[in-house]
């Protein structure tokens, strides 16, 4: 695996791959890699000739009082995991390489309406930071395909919309959620869950699946379903951020005649904010 810290040298290496007719896959991450990240790399490997993984803890997507300074930096371990699955390139720039003029002077990319709801409502500016850095990374790597995890469903929907609106020539591929045996979605932030909390945090996945089952059985009282789910999370001792039943494409509140629905939820433990989602496709 070749490791690059600078845009120019990575571009030169990838230009040679393109001249050789190679199809380039890309997996953008913030590091602290776990099995779900590695599965995204494997998906890219199945679809492409060479794979680039990036590791950059993007300060632009962290708000005030969020955990940018606490976010685990585990580059040596991450590199070893990528080497083990034969990733071709690792791009790990520093902040100056990505934001040479500083973040205050950085041109921003904004996807209207979709970035201000759900996670965007409680994390103002977060998705603006995501779309900006992903646009920059797409321009640097110029991949044929980019793989994102379904766990971050809103992020996936926002990036799909951004790519469509800006005519960026990249195929967005979704990787399924990878879960622990009790249903907890794998996340870099799971390391902040305490030992006392750990047996109970799968409540988020359970209540979302409960809503899914009731929708599949014909219920369309979305407001009541979401309220009951929030009550279950409260009863388990966690603070609810949101439970929402949405149109899978637009992220607007689901209508009774929608056929593709995603149920999204977020809750707080003592040291982490956890998100999850499940989708329903109705006949």
UniProtKB/Swiss-Prot annotation:
(R)-pantoate binds at residues 61, 155. ATP binds at residues 30-37, 149-152, 178, 186-189. It is found in: Cytoplasm. The active site is at 37 (proton donor). One of its GO terms (cellular component) is cytosol. Keywords: ATP-binding, Cytoplasm, Ligase, Nucleotide-binding, Pantothenate biosynthesis. It is an enzyme of class 6 (ligase). Belongs to the pantothenate synthetase family. This is Pantothenate synthetase. It comes from Cellvibrio japonicus (strain Ueda107) (Pseudomonas fluorescens subsp. cellulosa).
